[in-house]
Amino acid sequence: MIQSRRSFLKGVLALPLVVPDRLAWALPTNAESVVSPNGTIRFELVHGKNSPVKYQVKFRNRPVIEPSDLGLLVRTQDAPDKPSQHVARRTGPYAMRESFPTRGLRSIGVNQCNGAYFEIEGDAKYRLEVRAFDDGIAFRYLDEGDDTPRVPYELTTFVLPSESVVWFHDFQGHYEGVHARKNISEVKDGEWAAPPLTVRLPADVGYAAITEAALMNYAGMGLRADGRSGFKLTLGDQLPVSYPFELRYGLSEAKRLSQPAAIRGAIKTPWRVVMIGKDLNALVNCQIIEAVSPAPDRKFFPLGVNTKWVKPGRAVWKYLDGGQNTLDGMKEFSRLAGELGFEYNVVEGFWQRWSEAQMKELVDYANGYKVGTWFWKHSKELRTPYARRQFFELCNRVGVVGAKIDFFDHEAKEIIDLYQSLLRDAAEHQVMLEFHGSNKPAGENRTWPNELSRESIRGMEASRMTERAQHNTTLPFTRFLAGPADYTPMHFGERRRETSWSHQVASAAIFTSPLLIYAAHPRNILDNPAVELIKNIPSVWDETVVLDSSEIGKLAAYARRKGTKWFLAIMNGPSPRKIDIGLDFLGRGNRRAVLVRDDMSEPAAVKIEHTTAHDKTALSIEMRSGGGFIGMFG
């Protein structure tokens, strides 16, 4: 629904009285708005004769984004000035109502929004496209341009309501940081936030998160605090150099990538996304990132995410829990993967010491156990079309089905372009990918279904990680909002720190990753008392429900369905607790249940219970500090 001030009162008269949120809104002078299909979310564009264009976002008549700057400057030089004025007019209102197959949180995605274009004039001239969804808003800048190299510079800011609480980490570890929780008044000028930035809105209004989607032919974004409740969108060349990038590539390469990238032809920025929900369930289930990302190319993916050669699955991995870096060692891992019913074995870089005959020997051996093989590769070795073609042709020759590409660690346009080239070239050879040392996801897995997952998270590889329980119960409501993450969950040794075995098993069912790589040695999984339940945890889900008892940094409780089977998975934070959980999500009928509980006397043990349950059952669950619970209902 698109409204101007002149038509607003006329529109109100036609509204049913059962939607009071709509009736309370009054637009300021010289304002245009785009309203979500259900009327609860409004994007307002405010402009005056001699003032810059600003926007604001409201949810149920309460502010989510306070009046904030926006704008796109395009220059042939890299030091643009602020525009003196903008004047806006609205064009082309439209509505979208569609569904599409997806994977991860759910099997069906929905794109329902109202949209409009706004022509912006003044010192800069461009189009602003806005879409309002029932779970947030998205906007982007469009500039037709010509073949002259031009450098884009954005004025976009996100000013949050006072009394908001935010969760974010900086760029020191690129996207492998630990989230801080701060009142917005405590965030200082110059602090950096790596998206997504999660927000708890004041007065129990709900939650929001800020990130981007459909990132291509453009630099990735970060957020820089202004010390006044605002965050300024900052492009990749201006972001601080991360420790991983400096370690792997050096400061001279970082300096080179700090030069703003010029774009030839039309400029289409990524969508700037504000996810909005009344609770954590609504926030986690927000579908905007996928909805605004381009659909997959039917040339490569005739059935989209269901294309035959693109197969999500679970994987064993020799890296964090013993094993041999040898051909025989990898044969053992593949055999054990088959015993677990897992689909893949991810082989680290030592495969490069083998001959092609040895590579094929492993692949053929693994195939005998219905286990596919993935190879690791350094991204610096795949910078040219020739190098990519050589590698993917090797994968085809020896039968490798997927590649784990590592060490990107930068949001510069050059690196974003590399992701796109890798995904396209891999698709041409029908090779699946996952990225490590990577940037946040931004909808790439919708456009390129051969991207199964990416790291961009502080996961089990972080051997010095402390306070893992608090970290793990924060991640589902922060990093995972942007998309799947390869945390490499479930370790039964010292890396689990203060978390229990039950917590570790539950993490595999909560941390979404269509390529679900397990940290534990497969023998240790087979020897665990919970192995029969672990074997049944899928890597993709048909439905995800975040339960009301969830609280960021304290408790993550998910009910998830695959087919007719439900899982209840809970990770507890630092404080021991006892909670009661109703099983109304099960629907009618009795179900056989397997419950894995904390052993309250020993964190490195579990208690297994076999019982029956139905939708009227209420489970009483006691968890230790860093504890957990997981139940399977067949």
List each model region and its residues.
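N-terminal secretory signal peptides and thylakoid transit peptides that target proteins
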Residues: M1-P16
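C-terminal segment of N-terminal export signals and the immediately downstream linker at the start
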Residues: P20-P37
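N-terminal accessory beta-strand-rich subdomains and adjacent acidic, glycine-rich linkers
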Residues: S33-S293
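Solvent-exposed beta-strand/loop surfaces of large extracellular or lumenal domains
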Residues: L105-S107, H169-E176, L595-K616
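An acidic-aromatic substrate-binding cleft motif
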Residues: I267-L280, Q287-M330, L340
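Aromatic- and carboxylate-enriched substrate-binding clefts and catalytic-loop regions
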Residues: F350-S500
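Carbohydrate-binding surface patches
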Residues: E551-G589, F629-I630
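C-terminal beta-strand-rich structural cap/linker in extracellular carbohydrate-active enzymes
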Residues: T612-G634
